[in-house]
């Protein structure tokens, strides 16, 4: 089952319709985290690097075999984490391009009803960025200035959470 990025996030961001379970590596998440997501990687950075090298040299089948071998010792703990994250509220699995890692996490978590995102993180990012420009164009910038101690920070704290911000 697949979910479109625009069905997960409203234009220009906001609370996702489902809780994203981000199975990208920690390094990938560090370069761009998803709003409201819980990061539970299927591969750590070293494992991802090893799989990527094999993929480039030997192809997908060999890379999948390496991925299975390097993740086997951690699989039980990762499965339990994905299951716990998918319990209690509607969730969706997300990887880089919406392919093998999110499909594998869904299968291994024994949650076939939990969708994955079409196009993964890349498609979500594109969707959010496309919605950002029109959203910003509809707003009037407001600049807060003043000398030190004039209450600028207090004002910002009082306005925190205001729908216009």
Residue ranges and their predicted role:
Residues 1-115, 131-138, 142-154, 160-165:
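Cytosolic catalytic domains that perform sulfur/thiol-centered chemistry
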């Amino acid at each position: 089952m697949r979910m479109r990025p625009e069905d997960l996030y409203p234009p220009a961001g906001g609370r996702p319709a489902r809780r994203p379970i981000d199975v990208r590596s920690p390094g990938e998440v560090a370069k761009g985290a998803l709003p409201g997501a819980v990061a539970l990687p299927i591969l750590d950075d070293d494992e991802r690097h090893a799989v990527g090298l094999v993929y480039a040299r030997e192809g997908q089948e060999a890379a999948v075999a390496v991925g299975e071998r390097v993740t086997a010792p951690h699989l039980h703990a990762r499965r339990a984490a994905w299951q716990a994250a998918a319990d209690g509220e509607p969730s969706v699995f997300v990887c880089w391009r919406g392919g093998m890692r999110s499909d594998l996490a869904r299968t291994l978590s024994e949650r076939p009803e939990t969708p994955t995102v079409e196009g993964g993180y890349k498609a979500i990012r594109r969707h959010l960025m496309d919605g950002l420009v029109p959203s910003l164009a509809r707003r009037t910038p407001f600049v807060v200035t003043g000398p030190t101690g004039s209450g600028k920070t207090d004002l910002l704290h009082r306005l925190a959470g205001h729908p216009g911000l």
